[in-house]
Regions:
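Catalytic pocket-lining loop regions of alpha/beta-barrel enzymes
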Residues: 100-233
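Active-site gating/metal-coordination segments in enzymes
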Residues: 38-135, 139, 200-203
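Divalent metal-coordination and catalytic microenvironments
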Residues: 23, 47, 60, 87, ...
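Mid-to-C-terminal alpha-helical segments outside catalytic/metal-binding sites
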Residues: 9-30, 221-222, 226-233, 240-279
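Short, electropositive alpha-helical surface patch
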Residues: 43-57, 141-147, 218-225, 251-257
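Active-site neighborhood of phospho(di)ester-bond hydrolases with catalytic His/Asp-centered motifs
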Residues: 32-35, 61-62, 88, 150-152, ...
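Short, acidic/polar
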Residues: 12-22, 68-79, 183-184
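Acidic/histidine-rich helix-loop elements
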Residues: 1-13, 96-99
Length: 279
């Protein structure tokens, strides 16, 4: 994953200073900052520097190459020097026939170190390998029960990465399913009994659901009923998904409006803080 030209330049200040200013403006104490690997590759230098500069405000989530034999030692060394929030795994390109990035012998060493360091591992899927990757992830979660496994964009079909050149995919390429199943197929439902599996609901989900005329609050309520409200967390995707933070936060509150007060707090704050910040 050597990086690529972005779909569009971020329309918010994505520097560490800009992020902290945004946090101050919205009275946010801490955030997880996730490496934007499809642009910057596996070089996590800036996000690590930002977290060192603002250790009480920014928690780094690193994107690593699990096929690289040096990754486990790299993670141990970095964890000795500063607090890490977690890691994220993604295929470097859309290849439906290879899961080396997730389940190879080398990748198992990275999973082992994640369990050793108590780091959550987030995973994101391309459309073409989604089914095989979810099946593999279920096996891996069982092998490493001490690792919180976080599926980005819930793992539903409309939350996958568009396969093809790194260009903006039109929303018409995604066809979310409404009631009664809301895109939760048997693959995702089958993860409900794996207690170290968690599901990140993001602005990408909300944008695509809204484009299809599907109420986001009904979607999140259904996720809570099927997967468990304590397994859900919100991710703003600010800096990746275009648009300012405020409307994204408003959309998240709207999506959480059918949750109970306790479920809402867990979804919008507590579950993510517990997994990534030990809060």
């Amino acid at each position: 994953m050597g990086g690529a030209k972005p779909q569009a330049q971020p329309d918010v200040d994505t520097s560490a200073e800009g992020l902290v200013a945004l946090m101050d403006a919205h009275e946010i104490g801490q955030v997880c900052a996730v490496q934007r690997a499809f642009i910057y590759g596996y070089d996590n230098s800036y996000i690590l520097d930002a977290a060192r500069a603002y250790p009480d405000r920014i928690t780094p989530v690193l994107v690593v190459d699990a096929t690289d034999a040096s990754t486990p030692s790299l993670l141990r060394r970095l964890a000795d020097g500063q607090r890490l929030g977690g890691i994220r795994l993604s295929a470097p390109r859309a290849n439906p026939f290879s899961l080396d990035w997730l389940e190879s012998p080398a990748a198992m060493e990275t999973w082992q170190v994640a369990e050793e360091l108590r780091l959550p591992v987030a995973v994101i899927f391309f459309r073409t390998h989604r089914e095989r990757a979810i099946s593999a992830l279920a096996r891996i979660a069982g092998r490493f029960p001490g690792v919180p496994v976080v599926i980005d964009h819930v793992g539903v079909p409309h939350g996958t990465i568009y396969d093809g050149e790194y260009v903006a995919a039109p929303e018409s390429e995604f066809h979310p399913e409404g009631a009664p199943n809301f895109d939760l197929d048997e693959l995702v439902r089958g993860l409900a009994d794996i207690r170290n599996m968690f599901f990140k609901v993001t602005s990408i989900n909300f944008r695509r659901l809204t484009a299809a005329g599907i109420p986001t609050a009904s979607f999140v309520r259904h996720l809570a009923d099927v997967l468990g409200a304590d397994r859900l967390m919100w991710g703003s995707d600010v800096g990746q998904t275009l648009g300012p933070y405020g409307p994204k936060a408003d959309a998240a509150r709207l999506a959480a409006s059918e949750l109970s007060p306790a479920e809402r707090v867990a979804f919008l704050r507590d579950t993510g803080a517990r997994l990534y910040m030990n809060a």
